[in-house]
Protein backbone atom coordinates (compact mmCIF):
# COMPACT_ATOMS: atom_id res chain seq x y z
CA UNK A 1 0.00 0.00 0.00
CA UNK A 2 1.00 3.63 -0.17
CA UNK A 3 2.95 5.06 2.66
CA UNK A 4 3.10 8.66 3.69
CA UNK A 5 6.37 10.47 3.65
CA UNK A 6 6.67 13.02 6.46
CA UNK A 7 4.95 16.23 5.40
CA UNK A 8 7.26 19.14 5.15
CA UNK A 9 6.35 22.06 7.34
CA UNK A 10 6.38 25.27 5.35
CA UNK A 11 6.81 28.78 6.57
CA UNK A 12 3.61 30.74 6.32
CA UNK A 13 3.70 34.00 4.47
CA UNK A 14 3.46 37.19 6.42
CA UNK A 15 0.24 39.03 7.05
CA UNK A 16 1.34 41.50 4.41
CA UNK A 17 -0.18 39.11 1.90
CA UNK A 18 -3.68 39.67 3.23
CA UNK A 19 -6.27 39.72 0.47
CA UNK A 20 -5.91 43.28 -0.72
CA UNK A 21 -4.49 43.05 -4.22
CA UNK A 22 -6.54 42.18 -7.27
CA UNK A 23 -5.44 40.86 -10.65
CA UNK A 24 -6.98 40.71 -14.07
CA UNK A 25 -8.62 37.35 -14.68
CA UNK A 26 -7.84 34.06 -12.97
CA UNK A 27 -4.38 32.65 -12.31
CA UNK A 28 -2.90 29.25 -11.57
CA UNK A 29 0.13 27.64 -9.99
CA UNK A 30 1.15 24.11 -10.91
CA UNK A 31 3.93 21.76 -9.89
CA UNK A 32 4.71 18.73 -12.03
CA UNK A 33 6.76 15.84 -10.68
CA UNK A 34 8.11 13.08 -12.93
CA UNK A 35 10.06 10.04 -11.74
CA UNK A 36 11.35 7.53 -14.30
CA UNK A 37 12.92 4.24 -13.26
CA UNK A 38 15.86 2.92 -15.29
CA UNK A 39 16.85 -0.59 -14.21
CA UNK A 40 20.56 -1.23 -14.40
CA UNK A 41 21.37 2.47 -14.77
CA UNK A 42 21.07 3.76 -11.25
CA UNK A 43 18.29 5.38 -9.25
CA UNK A 44 15.17 6.76 -10.95
CA UNK A 45 15.47 10.22 -12.40
CA UNK A 46 13.31 12.81 -10.65
CA UNK A 47 12.35 16.11 -12.26
CA UNK A 48 10.14 18.86 -10.90
CA UNK A 49 8.99 22.00 -12.67
CA UNK A 50 6.78 24.78 -11.36
CA UNK A 51 4.53 27.06 -13.39
CA UNK A 52 2.62 30.22 -12.64
CA UNK A 53 0.05 30.56 -15.39
CA UNK A 54 1.99 29.74 -18.56
CA UNK A 55 5.41 30.68 -17.18
CA UNK A 56 7.87 28.12 -15.85
CA UNK A 57 9.63 29.65 -12.86
CA UNK A 58 11.52 26.83 -11.10
CA UNK A 59 13.07 23.47 -11.99
CA UNK A 60 14.85 20.62 -10.23
CA UNK A 61 16.62 17.65 -11.86
CA UNK A 62 18.12 14.85 -9.78
CA UNK A 63 20.53 14.10 -12.65
CA UNK A 64 22.18 17.51 -12.45
CA UNK A 65 25.84 17.62 -11.42
CA UNK A 66 24.79 19.34 -8.20
CA UNK A 67 21.01 18.81 -7.86
CA UNK A 68 19.37 21.99 -6.68
CA UNK A 69 16.20 23.91 -7.39
CA UNK A 70 16.97 26.53 -10.02
CA UNK A 71 15.13 29.69 -11.07
CA UNK A 72 13.57 29.83 -14.50
CA UNK A 73 12.07 33.33 -14.35
CA UNK A 74 13.75 36.62 -13.36
CA UNK A 75 11.16 37.53 -10.74
CA UNK A 76 11.79 34.40 -8.64
CA UNK A 77 15.51 35.12 -8.36
CA UNK A 78 14.82 37.64 -5.58
CA UNK A 79 14.00 34.80 -3.18
CA UNK A 80 16.71 34.31 -0.57
CA UNK A 81 19.04 31.35 0.05
CA UNK A 82 16.68 29.79 2.59
CA UNK A 83 14.01 29.45 -0.08
CA UNK A 84 16.28 27.55 -2.46
CA UNK A 85 17.83 25.41 0.29
CA UNK A 86 14.43 24.44 1.67
CA UNK A 87 12.98 23.53 -1.69
CA UNK A 88 16.07 21.58 -2.69
CA UNK A 89 15.73 19.43 0.42
CA UNK A 90 12.05 18.92 -0.29
CA UNK A 91 12.79 17.70 -3.80
CA UNK A 92 15.52 15.34 -2.64
CA UNK A 93 13.12 13.83 -0.11
CA UNK A 94 10.42 13.58 -2.77
CA UNK A 95 12.81 11.78 -5.11
CA UNK A 96 13.37 9.14 -2.44
CA UNK A 97 9.65 8.86 -1.79
CA UNK A 98 8.99 8.34 -5.49
CA UNK A 99 11.62 5.61 -5.68
CA UNK A 100 9.74 3.65 -3.05
CA UNK A 101 6.48 4.37 -4.81
CA UNK A 102 7.77 3.03 -8.11
CA UNK A 103 8.83 -0.19 -6.43
CA UNK A 104 5.43 -0.67 -4.84
CA UNK A 105 3.51 0.21 -7.96
CA UNK A 106 5.50 -2.35 -9.88
CA UNK A 107 4.30 -4.88 -7.34
CA UNK A 108 0.69 -3.71 -7.50
CA UNK A 109 0.66 -4.30 -11.24
CA UNK A 110 2.72 -7.51 -11.11
CA UNK A 111 5.44 -6.04 -13.32
CA UNK A 112 9.00 -7.30 -13.63
CA UNK A 113 12.04 -5.36 -12.48
CA UNK A 114 13.40 -5.18 -16.02
CA UNK A 115 11.19 -2.48 -17.48
CA UNK A 116 11.24 1.28 -17.06
CA UNK A 117 8.21 2.89 -15.42
CA UNK A 118 7.02 6.44 -14.88
CA UNK A 119 5.27 8.04 -11.93
CA UNK A 120 3.86 11.52 -12.44
CA UNK A 121 2.03 13.89 -10.18
CA UNK A 122 0.64 17.36 -10.41
CA UNK A 123 -0.72 19.69 -7.77
CA UNK A 124 -1.64 23.33 -7.49
CA UNK A 125 -4.37 25.90 -7.19
CA UNK A 126 -6.34 28.43 -9.22
CA UNK A 127 -7.34 31.84 -7.88
CA UNK A 128 -9.81 34.41 -9.13
CA UNK A 129 -9.30 38.15 -9.69
CA UNK A 130 -9.79 38.72 -5.95
CA UNK A 131 -6.99 36.30 -5.10
CA UNK A 132 -9.29 33.70 -3.55
CA UNK A 133 -9.24 30.00 -4.29
CA UNK A 134 -11.27 28.83 -7.27
CA UNK A 135 -10.08 25.23 -7.36
CA UNK A 136 -7.36 22.96 -6.05
CA UNK A 137 -5.71 20.05 -7.85
CA UNK A 138 -3.80 16.96 -6.76
CA UNK A 139 -3.46 14.11 -9.26
CA UNK A 140 -1.24 11.13 -10.00
CA UNK A 141 -0.55 8.95 -13.01
CA UNK A 142 1.46 5.76 -13.53
CA UNK A 143 2.93 4.77 -16.88
CA UNK A 144 0.90 7.45 -18.62
CA UNK A 145 -2.48 6.46 -17.20
CA UNK A 146 -4.57 8.05 -14.48
CA UNK A 147 -3.93 6.51 -11.07
CA UNK A 148 -5.61 8.53 -8.32
CA UNK A 149 -6.86 12.10 -7.99
CA UNK A 150 -8.25 14.38 -5.32
CA UNK A 151 -11.82 15.26 -6.18
CA UNK A 152 -12.97 18.82 -6.71
CA UNK A 153 -14.46 18.92 -3.21
CA UNK A 154 -10.90 18.42 -1.86
CA UNK A 155 -12.33 15.87 0.58
CA UNK A 156 -12.35 12.57 -1.31
CA UNK A 157 -10.37 10.58 -3.87
CA UNK A 158 -11.11 8.90 -7.18
CA UNK A 159 -9.10 5.75 -7.89
CA UNK A 160 -8.67 4.69 -11.52
CA UNK A 161 -8.35 0.94 -10.91
CA UNK A 162 -8.10 -1.75 -8.24
CA UNK A 163 -4.42 -1.02 -7.60
CA UNK A 164 -5.20 2.63 -6.97
CA UNK A 165 -7.95 1.58 -4.57
CA UNK A 166 -5.22 0.24 -2.28
CA UNK A 167 -3.77 3.72 -2.18
CA UNK A 168 -7.19 5.27 -1.74
CA UNK A 169 -7.97 3.16 1.34
CA UNK A 170 -4.60 4.00 2.87
CA UNK A 171 -5.03 7.72 2.31
CA UNK A 172 -8.58 7.72 3.58
CA UNK A 173 -7.46 6.00 6.78
CA UNK A 174 -4.70 8.59 7.20
CA UNK A 175 -7.11 11.49 6.45
CA UNK A 176 -4.69 12.58 3.77
CA UNK A 177 -7.29 14.64 1.92
CA UNK A 178 -7.58 16.97 4.90
CA UNK A 179 -3.87 17.74 4.75
CA UNK A 180 -4.02 18.34 1.02
CA UNK A 181 -7.03 20.59 1.36
CA UNK A 182 -5.33 22.64 4.08
CA UNK A 183 -2.36 23.25 1.80
CA UNK A 184 -4.39 24.00 -1.31
CA UNK A 185 -6.71 26.42 0.47
CA UNK A 186 -3.93 28.08 2.44
CA UNK A 187 -0.26 28.01 1.53
CA UNK A 188 -0.80 27.31 -2.16
CA UNK A 189 -2.98 30.40 -2.53
CA UNK A 190 -0.61 32.51 -0.44
CA UNK A 191 2.44 31.54 -2.45
CA UNK A 192 0.64 32.09 -5.73
CA UNK A 193 -0.43 35.55 -4.63
CA UNK A 194 3.14 36.31 -3.61
CA UNK A 195 4.44 35.25 -7.01
CA UNK A 196 1.79 37.25 -8.83
CA UNK A 197 2.81 40.32 -6.87
CA UNK A 198 6.56 39.82 -7.36
CA UNK A 199 6.24 38.96 -11.03
CA UNK A 200 3.28 41.12 -11.97
CA UNK A 201 5.16 43.02 -14.67
CA UNK A 202 5.77 39.74 -16.50
CA UNK A 203 2.82 37.62 -15.42
CA UNK A 204 0.19 40.31 -15.94
CA UNK A 205 1.43 41.22 -19.39
CA UNK A 206 -0.58 40.49 -22.51
CA UNK A 207 1.64 40.30 -25.60
CA UNK A 208 -0.52 40.35 -28.74
CA UNK A 209 0.15 37.79 -31.47
CA UNK A 210 1.95 38.64 -34.68
CA UNK A 211 -0.28 37.19 -37.38
CA UNK A 212 -0.17 36.36 -41.07
CA UNK A 213 -1.57 33.85 -43.56
CA UNK A 214 0.55 31.67 -45.83
CA UNK A 215 -0.45 29.81 -48.99
CA UNK A 216 0.82 26.32 -49.84
CA UNK A 217 -0.28 24.75 -53.16
CA UNK A 218 -1.19 21.07 -52.94
CA UNK A 219 -2.15 20.48 -56.57
CA UNK A 220 -3.62 22.37 -59.49
CA UNK A 221 -6.98 22.19 -57.74
CA UNK A 222 -6.26 22.70 -54.03
CA UNK A 223 -4.10 24.73 -51.67
CA UNK A 224 -3.57 24.99 -47.94
CA UNK A 225 -4.11 28.30 -46.18
CA UNK A 226 -2.31 28.46 -42.85
CA UNK A 227 -3.05 31.18 -40.30
CA UNK A 228 -0.12 31.88 -37.99
CA UNK A 229 -0.08 33.50 -34.54
CA UNK A 230 3.40 34.13 -33.10
CA UNK A 231 4.98 35.70 -30.05
CA UNK A 232 1.87 35.95 -27.87
CA UNK A 233 1.35 35.64 -24.11
CA UNK A 234 -0.55 34.28 -22.26
CA UNK A 235 -1.07 30.99 -24.07
CA UNK A 236 -4.83 31.14 -24.40
CA UNK A 237 -5.80 32.09 -27.95
CA UNK A 238 -8.52 31.30 -30.48
CA UNK A 239 -7.87 30.77 -34.20
CA UNK A 240 -10.82 29.98 -36.47
CA UNK A 241 -11.35 29.82 -40.23
CA UNK A 242 -14.54 30.94 -41.95
CA UNK A 243 -15.76 30.49 -45.51
CA UNK A 244 -18.13 33.24 -46.58
CA UNK A 245 -18.71 33.96 -42.89
CA UNK A 246 -19.44 30.36 -41.87
CA UNK A 247 -17.16 28.56 -39.43
CA UNK A 248 -15.03 25.78 -40.89
CA UNK A 249 -14.26 24.09 -37.58
CA UNK A 250 -14.71 20.54 -38.87
CA UNK A 251 -12.33 21.15 -41.77
CA UNK A 252 -9.66 23.02 -39.82
CA UNK A 253 -6.34 21.49 -38.81
CA UNK A 254 -5.39 23.11 -35.52
CA UNK A 255 -2.13 22.48 -33.68
CA UNK A 256 -1.75 22.73 -29.93
CA UNK A 257 -0.40 26.00 -28.61
CA UNK A 258 3.34 25.55 -28.20
CA UNK A 259 6.11 27.49 -26.42
CA UNK A 260 8.47 29.48 -28.61
CA UNK A 261 11.41 29.31 -26.21
CA UNK A 262 11.33 33.02 -25.36
CA UNK A 263 8.41 32.96 -22.87
CA UNK A 264 5.89 33.48 -25.66
CA UNK A 265 3.77 31.04 -27.64
CA UNK A 266 2.95 29.97 -31.20
CA UNK A 267 -0.05 28.43 -32.89
CA UNK A 268 -1.45 27.88 -36.38
CA UNK A 269 -4.68 26.76 -37.99
CA UNK A 270 -4.96 25.49 -41.56
CA UNK A 271 -7.68 24.71 -44.10
CA UNK A 272 -7.54 23.10 -47.53
CA UNK A 273 -9.34 25.28 -50.08
CA UNK A 274 -10.17 25.01 -53.80
CA UNK A 275 -7.67 26.90 -55.92
CA UNK A 276 -9.07 30.27 -56.92
CA UNK A 277 -11.39 30.52 -53.91
CA UNK A 278 -8.82 31.66 -51.38
CA UNK A 279 -10.40 35.08 -50.90
CA UNK A 280 -13.62 33.49 -49.64
CA UNK A 281 -11.74 32.33 -46.53
CA UNK A 282 -10.94 34.47 -43.50
CA UNK A 283 -8.95 33.68 -40.37
CA UNK A 284 -10.23 35.11 -37.09
CA UNK A 285 -7.88 35.63 -34.14
CA UNK A 286 -8.91 36.38 -30.56
CA UNK A 287 -6.41 37.06 -27.77
CA UNK A 288 -6.49 39.24 -24.66
CA UNK A 289 -3.53 41.23 -25.96
CA UNK A 290 -5.57 42.43 -28.95
CA UNK A 291 -7.81 45.49 -28.58
CA UNK A 292 -10.31 43.67 -30.81
CA UNK A 293 -10.38 40.37 -32.74
CA UNK A 294 -8.43 40.27 -35.99
CA UNK A 295 -9.69 39.13 -39.38
CA UNK A 296 -7.08 38.06 -41.93
CA UNK A 297 -7.07 36.94 -45.55
CA UNK A 298 -4.29 35.59 -47.68
CA UNK A 299 -2.70 38.45 -49.58
CA UNK A 300 -0.91 37.04 -52.66
CA UNK A 301 1.33 40.06 -53.01
CA UNK A 302 2.66 39.70 -49.45
CA UNK A 303 3.46 35.98 -49.55
CA UNK A 304 6.79 35.48 -47.83
CA UNK A 305 8.85 32.53 -46.67
CA UNK A 306 10.57 34.48 -43.90
CA UNK A 307 7.87 33.86 -41.25
CA UNK A 308 8.00 30.14 -42.01
CA UNK A 309 11.74 30.10 -41.37
CA UNK A 310 11.07 31.80 -38.05
CA UNK A 311 8.56 29.14 -37.16
CA UNK A 312 10.97 26.34 -37.97
CA UNK A 313 13.60 27.94 -35.76
CA UNK A 314 11.05 28.38 -33.00
CA UNK A 315 9.99 24.76 -33.20
CA UNK A 316 13.61 23.69 -32.96
CA UNK A 317 13.88 25.68 -29.73
CA UNK A 318 10.64 24.07 -28.58
CA UNK A 319 12.09 20.60 -29.09
CA UNK A 320 15.05 21.46 -26.89
CA UNK A 321 12.78 22.94 -24.22
CA UNK A 322 10.50 19.93 -24.17
CA UNK A 323 13.31 17.38 -24.06
CA UNK A 324 15.09 19.31 -21.32
CA UNK A 325 12.01 19.69 -19.15
CA UNK A 326 10.64 16.14 -19.34
CA UNK A 327 7.69 17.62 -17.55
CA UNK A 328 4.79 15.73 -16.14
CA UNK A 329 2.64 15.95 -19.16
CA UNK A 330 4.95 13.68 -21.16
CA UNK A 331 2.73 10.67 -20.55
CA UNK A 332 -0.11 12.01 -18.45
CA UNK A 333 -3.25 13.11 -20.17
CA UNK A 334 -3.79 16.78 -19.47
CA UNK A 335 -6.80 17.41 -17.33
CA UNK A 336 -8.76 20.51 -17.91
CA UNK A 337 -8.69 23.06 -15.14
CA UNK A 338 -10.49 26.30 -14.71
CA UNK A 339 -8.12 29.25 -14.95
CA UNK A 340 -5.01 29.98 -16.87
CA UNK A 341 -2.29 27.51 -17.26
CA UNK A 342 -4.04 24.23 -17.70
CA UNK A 343 -3.68 21.57 -15.11
CA UNK A 344 -2.39 18.35 -13.74
CA UNK A 345 -1.49 19.24 -10.32
CA UNK A 346 0.16 17.38 -7.56
CA UNK A 347 0.45 17.19 -3.88
CA UNK A 348 3.84 18.55 -3.51
CA UNK A 349 3.10 21.51 -1.44
CA UNK A 350 5.83 23.95 -1.29
CA UNK A 351 6.52 26.79 -3.24
CA UNK A 352 8.31 26.84 -2.04
CA UNK A 353 7.53 23.42 -3.27
CA UNK A 354 5.61 21.41 -0.84
CA UNK A 355 6.99 17.95 -0.68
CA UNK A 356 4.40 15.43 -1.60
CA UNK A 357 3.56 13.56 1.49
CA UNK A 358 2.65 10.63 -0.41
CA UNK A 359 4.81 7.96 -1.63
CA UNK A 360 3.24 5.20 -3.59
CA UNK A 361 5.03 2.77 -1.39
CA UNK A 362 4.11 -0.01 0.95
UniProtKB/Swiss-Prot annotation:
Outcome of substituting residue 299 to K: In allele B*73:01
Effect of residue 291 to Q: In allele B*73:01
Stretches in topological domain Extracellular: 25-309
Annotated consequence of substituting residue 140 to L: In allele B*13:02, allele B*45:01, allele B*49:01, allele B*50:01, allele B*54:01, allele B*55:01, allele B*56:01, allele B*59:01 and allele B*82:01; requires 2 nucleotide substitutions
A Pfam family that the UniProt record links to this protein: MHC_I_C
Phenotype for residue 33 to D: In allele B*08:01; associated with increased risk for rheumatoid arthritis
Gene3D superfamilies: Immunoglobulins, MHC class I-like antigen recognition-like
Outcome following mutation: residue 94 to N: In allele B*08:01, allele B*13:02, allele B*14:01, allele B*15:01, allele B*18:01, allele B*35:01, allele B*37:01, allele B*38:01, allele B*39:02, allele B*40:01, allele B*40:02, allele B*41:01, allele B*44:02, allele B*45:01, allele B*47:01, allele B*48:01, allele B*49:01, allele B*50:01, allele B*51:01, allele B*52:01, allele B*53:01, allele B*59:01 and allele B*78:01; requires 2 nucleotide substitutions
Organism, scientific name: Homo sapiens
Name of the gene encoding the protein in the UniProt record: HLA-B
UniProt entry tagged with the keyword Signal: yes
Protein name: HLA class I histocompatibility antigen, B alpha chain
Amino acid sequence: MLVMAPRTVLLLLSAALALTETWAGSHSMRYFYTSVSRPGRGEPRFISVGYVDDTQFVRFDSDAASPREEPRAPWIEQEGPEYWDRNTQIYKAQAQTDRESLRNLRGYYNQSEAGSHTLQSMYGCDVGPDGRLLRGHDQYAYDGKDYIALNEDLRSWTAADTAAQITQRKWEAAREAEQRRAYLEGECVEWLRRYLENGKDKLERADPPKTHVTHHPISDHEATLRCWALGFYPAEITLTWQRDGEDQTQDTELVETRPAGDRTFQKWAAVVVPSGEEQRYTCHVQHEGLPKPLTLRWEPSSQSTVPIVGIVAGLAVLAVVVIGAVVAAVMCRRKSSGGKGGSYSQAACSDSAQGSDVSLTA
